Amino acid sequence: MVVYRLIEDPIFPHPDEAEPDGLLAVGGDLSPERLLSAYASGIFPWYDERSPILWWSLDPRLILNFDKLHVSRRVKRKVRKREYTVTFDRAFESVIANCARKFRPGQAGTWILPEMIEAYVKLHKLGFVHSVEVWNREGNLAGGLYGVSLGKVFSGESMFFLEPDASKVGFSYLVQWLKNREFHFVDCQQPTDHLKSLGAEEVSRELFLDMLDEALEHPALRGTWEFMEGEYEMITEVLS
């Protein structure tokens, strides 16, 4: 197969044209238009400072169906004891900066480069990218994650923790919040043992794209996300 070089227009080849490792295209930019076109097509950018922009569509793809969420006893205990408080869209730039600093075994640096941060901050301001913040009892950021929301699908980009299980607590609250709004699934993109431990499963690219098309039949939930009155306590009870 051929790896496509992108032109100025924010269009992509079909994901089925990707290489066996998932690499589909190279080049282009990180404009809001191109990024939204990518996510709507089941494609995401992932590269480092030594390479041009690379665009991927993996087969298989990792997703989380909400009824498969696994919450460990330890996380349940921390939720029950109110060790953390979870918010949305309160500190996006702090969350993505912490994700960029996160050490990842086997990687020499980070793929969340300055231009990547700038691009996702723009999408956050447009209401398409959202952050989850996890605060400890002292009011300090203990963990979090961020991702892209289109239609009824949330594509998780990265998560971090500064205290044990903080990101798992945030992810668990997010999943319940999305479920309450009839989202269809979370796109976890790349298979990792960590995400699989939370209940994520691999599906074929073909099935993923069918699920994505169905989820995109609904309008995006743009703007600042927040819990409805009484919802936070309800989710806390569910997760406990």
Swiss-Prot record:
Cystine crosslinks: none
UniProt cross-references to InterPro entries, sorted A to Z: Acyl_CoA_acyltransferase, Leu/Phe-tRNA_Trfase, Leu/Phe-tRNA_Trfase_C, Leu/Phe-tRNA_Trfase_N
Record protein name field: Leucyl/phenylalanyl-tRNA--protein transferase
UniProt KW keywords: Acyltransferase, Cytoplasm, Transferase
Location of the protein in the cell: Cytoplasm
CC annotations in GO: cytoplasm
Task performed by this protein: Functions in the N-end rule pathway of protein degradation where it conjugates Leu, Phe and, less efficiently, Met from aminoacyl-tRNAs to the N-termini of proteins containing an N-terminal arginine or lysine.
Family (UniProt): Belongs to the L/F-transferase family.
Biological processes, Gene Ontology terms: protein catabolic process
Provenance organism: Maridesulfovibrio salexigens (strain ATCC 14822 / DSM 2638 / NCIMB 8403 / VKM B-1763)
